[in-house]
Structures are given as structure tokens and as C-alpha cells.
């Protein structure tokens, strides 16, 4: 049974965003619903291109790894676009900023959290590689962990 209310995830391609879409995709699959990926529209004044290529790549990876079809949607930058696009969401899954330890969740995420009608889950990446993210996004934590493991292994005799 497919529910009409999607899991919604804003996506900008940052490390924690990849973890958020992976978790959101698995939630959507288990709940029998769809996944809506949000990316920003172009801003000609600042020379910023839209996120359509990024959303297409993420959508393809989600489809290949998790097996669900995503709904990419371009929205205006800022919290208002996220809130409007998530108005019918079953759940909102949001990756934290790379600066979350120093700055907290940030102004936009805070505004989305206050205005969201659906349950909201903030996600950060862990030390384990993800199945959805492209190989070049392997984190420094994973490399550090692998290095420590190699250094502590005892030679076999």
C-alpha cells in the first residue's frame, strides 16, 4: 500500500545530506510511501545554478540502492520553500550543517523545525560508509578508523 504523504528531505549534497536521504529512503520503503528530494532553484542574480543535476544523481542512487522512485522538486532558497514543499509530508528528514557543532542547527533548519507540521528528524553522518552516497564522499572519520585498525593489528606469526 502506497501512502499519498511522502517522506521529504532537503538535499544540497553535503555529507550529512547524504546520510539524511539514505535514512529517508529506507523509511519511505518501510512505510510504503515515496521520497521527495528538495533542491534549490537557480538564482541568476548570484550566478547560482539550480540543483537539478544533483537531485537527478541522488535520485538515481536511491533508486539503485534502495529500490524506490524519488520525486525531485526545485524550491526557492530559504526556509519558506522547505516548509511549503513539506506541507503534506509524512516526515521531514533533514541533514545537519557541516558546522553544526559550532553553530547548532542554523537559522534555516531552526525555522523549518518551528514551522514544520510533520515529525522532524535531524541527521548527521556517522563513521560508517553509506550505501547511497557516491564513493568519493567517504568521510575522514572512516579513513581515521581504518588507519587505527591497521595500526593496532598484531602481526601473525
Sequence positions of predicted segments:
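Short beta-strand elements at the ligand-binding edges of bilobed clamshell
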Residues: 6-12
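A structural signal for isolated positions on well-ordered beta-strands in alpha/beta enzyme cores
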Residues: 8, 34-38, 71, 121
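Short beta-strand/turn micro-motifs composed of small residues
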Residues: 11, 39-41, 96, 124
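Generic hydrophobic alpha-helical scaffold/packing signal
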Residues: 8, 25, 55-63, 71, ...
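Charged docking surfaces used in two-component/phosphorelay signaling
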Residues: 74-80
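Short, flexible loop segments at the rims of nucleotide/cofactor-binding pockets, characterized by
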Residues: 13, 69-74, 98-99
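Gly/Ser-rich helix-loop-strand patches that form or flank binding pockets
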Residues: 1-6, 83-150, 154-157
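Redox- and metal-dependent alpha/beta enzyme cores, enriched for Fe-S-associated oxidoreductases
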Residues: 13-66
Amino acid at each position: 500500500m502506497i501512502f499519498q504523504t511522502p517522506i521529504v528531505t532537503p538535499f544540497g549534497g553535503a555529507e550529512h545530506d547524504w546520510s539524511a536521504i539514505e535514512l529517508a529512503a529506507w523509511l519511505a520503503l518501510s512505510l510504503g510511501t515515496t521520497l521527495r528530494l528538495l533542491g534549490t532553484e537557480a538564482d541568476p542574480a548570484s550566478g547560482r545554478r539550480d540543483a537539478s543535476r544533483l537531485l537527478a544523481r541522488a535520485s538515481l542512487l536511491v533508486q539503485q540502492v534502495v529500490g524506490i522512485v524519488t520525486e525531485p522538486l526545485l524550491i526557492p532558497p530559504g526556509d519558506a520553500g522547505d516548509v511549503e514543499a513539506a506541507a503534506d509530508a509524512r516526515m521531514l528528514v533533514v541533514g545537519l550543517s557541516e558546522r553544526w557543532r559550532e553553530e547548532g542547527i542554523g537559522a534555516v533548519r531552526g525555522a523549518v523545525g518551528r514551522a514544520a507540521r510533520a515529525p522532524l528528524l535531524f541527521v548527521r553522518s556517522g563513521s560508517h560508509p553509506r550505501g547511497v552516497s557516491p564513493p568519493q564522499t567517504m568521510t575522514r572519520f572512516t579513513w581515521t578508523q581504518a588507519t587505527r585498525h591497521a595500526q593496532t593489528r598484531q602481526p601473525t606469526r
